Amino acid sequence: MLFSMVMFTERWWVGSKDCPRVPALENSNNPWRLERTATAAELSQYGNPTTCEIDNGGVIVADGFQASKGYTGDSIVDYNDAHYKTSVDQDAWGFVRAAYNRGRNTNRQSSGPHPLCTRKCIAWLLMGRLMNAVLTQSDNPALVPNQNATGSNSRPWKPLGKAQSYSNEELNNAPQFNPETLYASDTLIRFNGVNYISQSKEQKVSPSDSNPWRVFVDWTGTKERVGTPKKAWPKHVYAPYVDFTLNTIPDLRALAKNHNVNHFTLAFVVSKDANTTCGTAYGMQNYAQYSKIKALREAGGDVMLSIGGANNAPLAASCKNVDDLMQHYYDIVDNLNLKVLDFDIEGTWVAVQASIERRNLAVKKVQDKWKSEGKDIAIWYTLPILPTGLTPEGMNVLSDAKAKGVELAGVNVMTMDYGNAICQSANTEGQNIHGKCATSAIAFLHSQLKGLHPNKSDAEIDAMMGTTPMVGVNDVQGEVFYLSDARLVMQDAQKRNLGMVGIWSIARDLPAALTCLRNSTA
């Protein structure tokens, strides 16, 4: 990279905030390595950038929502770190996101589990506190080790705070809803014979009114910028990942023309607060790299998009409202003209139950919406794996998806970074150590998916599997994926007729020194 008349190389992944000042040649905390002074030819070709200001791709800056303020139609506000747009004029103390909570624990309850409380149990009362059944009622919610207060572990019970209980007399005599009354938060009312509790300060909003605020991202002109795919997405495909957050990405059309690589997986869309972005640095509306997608599609190729990844937070973690999350997924597919959508669930997020359930609920909702519109959008989940198969956390992601009715086209696994001694492969070119770890992982994955889908044939299970190794030097020290490993993995994929083969990543598919770990070489 050229910056301020100096050539730098990145030592690891860098984001938009990692501006290459003039660092010391050796600094373990600096992602940039100073190489040399730029030549006159390089300065003539690339110019001499001296600032790190970039086009944010259309990121919206909106004022924070104020409940005491009225809004005109088409107003855009920021609320709980997401943008919302109202379709109609709004009075003060009108809608926020949820005006009333219908019957949430408004009936008198005794301590102890509800007799019908199962895996789908909403809540029950324990010693004056509401508890939510995240997984199952079989574990005692009174025991702290079984509680999941922050949603960051896999325990089954989440405390919801102090319960609100009312006598039958209080419920029956609750004041009838009056649109002219300004209700404080947590006020009990009665509307059409049903009790409700206001979730915020409210006026002129009845429990039956439809909320006019909708999650909002400015997609103006995006559909035209990315072009439209000319062909259906293949049932069996090589779709290497493209790190779409890099300042420079490969020419996708040239790769299609010169190497017959026609399909790619773009990574990653993540949340900045609760809004959709490309790697947090770029907005979704007018991203400069969209022209490469359009050129590829005009040449007959196509892309799928991956949401998540190892860095930053996935949308399912930051966007707490399932309907908003569903709308994000719908808008991404609609405005980028996608036929396939991938969810890369890794790192700590593969074990955060709240985001797992929220994602699966939103995917089910958006799939139902697509079906009602006659659209066939394929959904893939990408998960970390060991040579012995998916981890319990990964299996939980898939089990929860099945329980919620999500229909997966496939499960792609990251056959990389195992952290297992048997996969140490530095200086073992030709022994296929890393390749054997990958094929072992796929064999175990087949058994695991067969257990989840016993009615599918072996061929159908193979067709819904994908393998994505990290070419060259992996993040885990001592793990290297060689060309001989690639041949073994491809042979196994062809034998099984896998649904997908990928690599991380196309930008890294270049030679480098054995110990060199970069996002632009392998």
From Swiss-Prot:
The keyword Glycoprotein applies. It holds the Pfam family Glyco_hydro_18. Its EC number is 3.2.1.14. One of its GO terms (biological process) is chitin catabolic process. GO terms for molecular function: chitin binding; endochitinase activity. PROSITE patterns: GH18_2. It is an enzyme of class 3 (hydrolase). Residues 1-24 form the signal peptide. InterPro entries: GH18_Chitinase, Glyco_hydro18_cat, Glycoside_hydrolase_SF. CDD domains: GH18_PF-ChiA-like. Glycans are attached at residues 148, 275, 455, 519. Belongs to the glycosyl hydrolase 18 family. Chitinase class V subfamily. Secreted chitinase involved in the degradation of chitin, a component of the cell walls of fungi and exoskeletal elements of some animals (including worms and arthropods). Participates in the infection process and directly acts in the penetration process of the host cuticle. This is Endochitinase 11.
